[in-house]
Amino acid sequence: MTSSRFIITVIGSDRVGIVARITTVMASYNVNIVDISQTIMQGIFTMIMLAEAPKENFDLAAFQHAMDAEGKSLGVEVKVQHEDVFRFMHRI
C-alpha cells in the first residue's frame, strides 16, 4: 500500500475519552497508528503518534480540519504534520 506518514500531537488537560475520540476520527479516515507514546504529567495529557494513511484519495486538509475540530470539542490542541515537515522543523 502506498501511504503518507504523519506526526500527530495531542496536548491539553486530561479528561476521560481523549484517546477514544481522537482515534475514532483517525479510523474514520482510514489512518493507522504506526507508533504511539502517551503520558499524563501533573494533569496534562500528552500524546504523540506516528500515523499512516493511504496516499490515494486521502484528503489531508479535511483530516486536519476534523482532527482540529475534535480537539477543540475536547479542549485539547491537536496538530497534524506530514512526517517530512516534522523532520525538517526538528532537525539539528
From Swiss-Prot:
Lineage: superkingdom: Archaea
ACT domain span: 7-81
Coiled coil residues, start to end: none
One Gene Ontology cellular component annotation held by this UniProt entry: cytosol
A Gene Ontology BP annotation from the UniProt entry: DNA-templated transcription
PANTHER family for this protein: UPF0237 PROTEIN MJ1558
Identification of the protein by name: UPF0237 protein MA_3235
The organism of origin for this protein: Methanosarcina acetivorans (strain ATCC 35395 / DSM 2834 / JCM 12185 / C2A)
